[in-house]
From Swiss-Prot:
This is Dual-specificity RNA methyltransferase RlmN. The keyword Methyltransferase applies. Its cofactor is [4Fe-4S] cluster. CDD domains: Radical_SAM. PANTHER family: 23S RRNA METHYLTRANSFERASE (PTHR30544), RADICAL SAM CORE DOMAIN-CONTAINING PROTEIN (PTHR30544:SF5). It comes from the Bacteria. The lineage of its organism: Bacteria, Pseudomonadati, Pseudomonadota, Gammaproteobacteria, Alteromonadales.
Length: 378
């Protein structure tokens, strides 16, 4: 087994096939992998000694070559509406934020995929802070794992805290495709968290080549961050549009949905920026832009953050905008803002995370004698 003794393998980094291969290399039967996955994801167990249907020799062997390691909760804040924001410390000491949003019999977890974000959308706090690095598979799925464990996981209280996952936290998921896809596979896998395809949503700002690859690899719900009715405005507020314009983005989204068994319409996210993208003329333009794309539109009231140049559209402007879209037969929803009193709402995820990350990076650089730290973006 390659480097198994020199470096323990984090089992949360492996999807079903990866864990089976790991056990094969150990000389164990594949069913042992399935037993361990159930302990990992159905009971959120992180101690091999608690896996009582494994013999003692195997448990001892696993202790030597494997570990179960998820991000740790450094801090949590609870909103007046019940939303909880978790500051999660990653394996190198940096932080990301994860948000748990309860509503009736469902609870949605907003999961981060990167430390910071490279796309620099002008209305997003995370994008304003810059990009540091991608999260590993274990750091992504580990957010779900840790919240399930913390809030009362399977078999412990009878509660299943996370019923839905949205890849809408810090970062652009499609710029970390090779780690995001295995993590989502574990969300869907019956031996993982067992969520249905309709309960896992990936949101993207339009990395078109990666969206084409996503279509070939996994079927989950797709949400697209559009935020403008035309290329001129989108170039300004979502800079990646200069590389992949609206027409390319929508065409790729249509191809994804046409192949999908999870959804028939693209979910279009549109943040409402006061007197920037919220006029009735822009509503008409948006409807015409979407005329060939089966879609439902999610209007998102802007959530201000320190240093932002934008204001939130008034309720009356949002209502007028929605009515125009509905005149074209479009399905329109206005997202209810959750967790804004703890900076956990859409576009606000950063808190003191980036400042803490920068301090850690400076310390690491100093330890390395000022050597630049390489960052992968794809």
């Amino acid at each position: 087994m390659t480097n198994a003794i020199d470096k323990k393998v984090n089992l949360l980094d492996l999807n079903r096939e990866g864990i089976k291969e790991f056990f094969r290399e150990m000389g164990e039967k594949p069913f042992r992998a399935e037993q361990v996955m159930k302990w990992l994801y159905h009971f959120c167990v992180d101690d091999f000694d608690e896996m009582t249907n494994l013999n003692k020799a195997l448990r001892e062997k696993l202790k030597q070559v494997a570990e179960i390691r998820a991000p740790e909760v450094r801090e949590q804040q609870q909103s007046s509406d019940g939303t909880i924001k978790f500051a999660m410390t990653l394996f190198d000491g940096q932080d990301v934020e994860t948000v748990w949003i309860p509503e009736g019999d469902r609870a949605t977890l907003c999961v981060s995929s990167q430390v910071g974000c490279a796309l620099e959308c002008t209305f997003c706090s995370t994008g304003a802070q810059g990009f540091n690095r991608n999260l590993s598979v274990a750091e992504i799925i580990g957010q779900v794992w840790r919240v399930n464990q913390l809030l009362g996981a399977y078999g412990k209280t009878g509660i299943k805290p996370v019923t839905n996952v949205v890849m809408m936290g810090m970062g652009e998921p499609l710029l970390n495709l090779n780690n995001v896809v295995p993590a989502m596979e574990l969300m869907l896998d019956d031996l993982g968290f067992g969520l249905s395809k309709r309960r896992v949503t990936l949101s993207t700002s339009g990395v078109v080549p990666a969206l084409e690859k996503l279509r070939e690899r996994i079927d989950v719900m797709l949400a697209i961050s559009l935020h403008a009715p035309d290329d001129e405005l989108r170039n300004e507020i979502v800079p990646i549009n200069k590389k992949y314009n609206i027409e390319e983005f929508l065409a790729s989204s249509r191809r994804y949905v046409e192949q999908s068994k999870a959804q028939r319409k693209v979910t279009v996210e549109y943040v409402m920026l006061d007197h920037v993208n919220d006029s009735t003329d822009q509503a008409h333009a948006l409807a015409k832009t979407l005329k060939d794309t089966p879609s439902k539109i999610n209007l998102i009231p802007f959530n201000p953050f320190p240093g932002s140049d934008y204001g939130r559209s008034s309720n009356s402007r949002i209502d007028r905008f929605a009515k125009v879209l509905m005149e074209y037969g479009l399905t329109v929803m206005v997202r209810k803002t959750r967790g804004d009193d703890i900076d956990a709402a859409c576009g606000q995820l950063v808190g003191d995370v980036i400042d803490r990350t920068k301090r850690i990076l400076k310390r690491q650089q100093k330890q390395r004698g000022g050597e630049a730290i390489a960052v992968k973006t794809t």
